[in-house]
Structure formats: structure tokens, C-alpha cells
Amino acid sequence: MKYHSETQTWEYLHGDKRVTWNSSFPKNDFYLSDYGLAFFYSPYYTAEDDNLEVCVNGEHSIGWLVTLSYLQEKDEELISQHPEWLNKFASIGTPLLVSHIVQNEPEFLIFQGNECCLSDVDLPSCHVLVYRLSKAKKDDIVSFLPQLYDKGFYYINKLSDVVNESLFYKSSYADNLIKEEKKRRINLKKNVYSEELVKLIKNLYEKWLPYSYINAFSRYIYLYQVVEYFMEIAFEESLFANIKKYNNKNISKNDLRKHIQDDSEEKAKIEMVFNGVSSNDSVVIDFKQNVKRFLGIIGSDFNGTTIGEHVYKIRNILVHNMRLAIDYETELNDIVECLEKLIVLKLKNSISENFNKHIVICDISEKYRTNRKRMRKTYVQFKYDNG
């Protein structure tokens, strides 16, 4: 393998063929020979950002489960927003993956004379485990399989196995291995905080909620971004809860699939964000009434009943049909103020005894209690504290 820094391209000479793959991950000083690859699929983790650090016994990290989608990411700005160590392992995983495909799965190559490149490998449920050989050998990976199996990751010998539906929910190893006593506990850690998320929460504290100096159209979109951040937290919590139920045999595979499919809908995610807010709350009632009045004025049909449907409908109008709303900023402002109040209600609920720490982090360099006090001071008391 040879790396061309000027074009950010990996080159692999295979006989008289030259295989290239452009990579946007910054090259590091790691040696390829110090790392190994193993392939897994998971029908539960299919988003590009479902990258998980693999730790043994809660201590040392052996590597990362990196989605195949993320390994093919070309947006350097997006990559820079992810954890440094994830990107280092992805940088190593890219040339190792190229070598594997050239040697073992050439059907993923596109040939043009003596040149060939990798095709876009569209396997969203596939993960590549990039691991340190100093921390785990190939035989060790076999001993980790039962724990990874329990967490919803199924070992496969090659990428193309993912498209074989008959392999789903089966292990490549005998069932008795899966049922053996587990000697090593595997922990999967998802790095929650990227620079972009920290920036988002900082803006949430310092600009979007406390001030209303921007126009209603932009303000609604800003606030919707806040809701989107909460949506990912809510979906992740729901996903882990359902996987736990499945692993404990409390629900069937079909039920699990249905839960994941239903919860992944954007309107359903919004509903999960606000499920702690009573539908009889005056803020909810005002929000729904203002939305319906606004949609009636601009002539847009709507028969939704849930908070999620109302929030999502206005978002779609502003993103896809702004021309319908452009003359009605005053009416939209009533909706924006209600959405602010809904977010504050969400935040109030989140610092109860059943708080979610993800929501109240403003500065990850400070202690959680410091952040919590700052949140209380910043906007739980700033203008909607008394109704």
C-alpha cells in the first residue's frame, strides 16, 4: 500500500492493476502491520454515526467498530467533528479495507483498463472492527464474539455476507460458543460529544433561547436544531432499551424490528422528546392552536394531532415552502414563542431526579454539577419560569 498525500489517495498494486481509493481521513503515523480487521453486521446500528469504541472489562480499548459508511465519508469538515481516536482508527481501517477487498472480494472493484477503484459499498448495517494487535489477536476476537453477539453485532467472514438475509440473526460460529460462560466483558462506548455538539449546546445556552433578536423564520429553524439534538438522544435511549428487552427475551425479533422502524421516523423522535410534557399543558394547547391557525392562513392542509406532527409540519413548510409563509412572520412568531416554552419545559423535566446528563452539558471541561447550576441560572429561570 502506498499513500499519496497530495491527492489523499491510497494506491494498491495488484498484478498489472492499480487500485486507488480516495480517503479524507488524515493519515497518521500508525503502522498498518500493527492493526487487524474483523467484520460484523448489526441490523440495529445502521446510521453512519453508529461508531463504537470496544473496551474489555471496562478498562483498555482494543479498537473501534466503525461503520462502513463512515469509512467512505468524504466531507472533511464532518470528519473533523468526530473524536480524534475514532478518526485515527478509521484512517488505519481504510487501507486495510482496500487490501481486504482487492485480495478477497474483487467484486467490489470497478475496472477501467489497467486502472480500477473501489465502488461505493452500500452496506449500512456493516461495521468494521479495527483493532490493535498488541491488545487483541485474531483468536481473541473469537472469544469476544459471545459478548458482541449479545449486544447485537454478528460476526461475518466478508462484507458480501451482509447481503445474505439467511445469515441474519445467526452466528458464524456454533450456538454452543454463544452459550458458553463469558470470560471477558465487552463494553461498547459511544463518544457522545463532538465539537459540533458542544457548539450546539453552547449556542443553546448563550444565544438561541435567551434572545429573540433574529427573525421568526430563522429562529424556528435554530430551535428545531435544538430539538434535533434531543431527538438523537431520545432515539438512542429507545434503541438501547428495546435491544435490552430483546436480549432478555421480553420481545420477539419482529417486535424489535417494528419498534426500531417506528421510532426512527422523525415525527416519532420528536414525540419522544416531548413525551414528558402533558398534552393538557397550556403551552402544548397554545402551540397546537397557533400552528393550526397559521396553517389555515397560508392554506396548507393538516390533520395531525401529536406535538411531533405539529413541530415537523412547520419545519417542512419553512424548509420546502417558505414562499407560503414569508408574509406571515407575526403569526409564525406566536408559534416560535410556544416552541421556546416547550423546550424550556423539556429542560425543566430533564433536571428532575430522572435527569439526562447529555442535555445539560454546556462545558465538558467542568463538573456536571457546575453545568447543572449554570443551566438553572441561564434559562430555567430566565423568562418562562413563572408560566
Question: What are the language-model segments listed below?
Answer:
Residues 246-305:
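Flexible secondary-structure boundary motifs
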Residues 130-135, 186-191, 242, 254-259, ...:
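Charged, low-complexity surface segments at secondary-structure and domain boundaries
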Residues 2-214, 229, 333-386:
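Charged, non-catalytic interaction/linker regions at domain boundaries
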Residues 230, 234, 264, 278-281, ...:
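Alpha-helix capping/termination and helix-coil
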Residues 197-204, 208-272:
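The feature marks a conserved, polyanion-engaging helical scaffold used by nucleic-acid processing enzymes
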Residues 246-254, 265-277, 354-366, 378-387:
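Short, surface-exposed, charge-dense and proline/glycine-enriched linear segments
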Residues 1, 8, 288-360:
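Charge-enriched, short contiguous segments at helix-coil
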Residues 235-238, 251, 282, 347, ...:
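Residue-level signal for secondary-structure boundary elements
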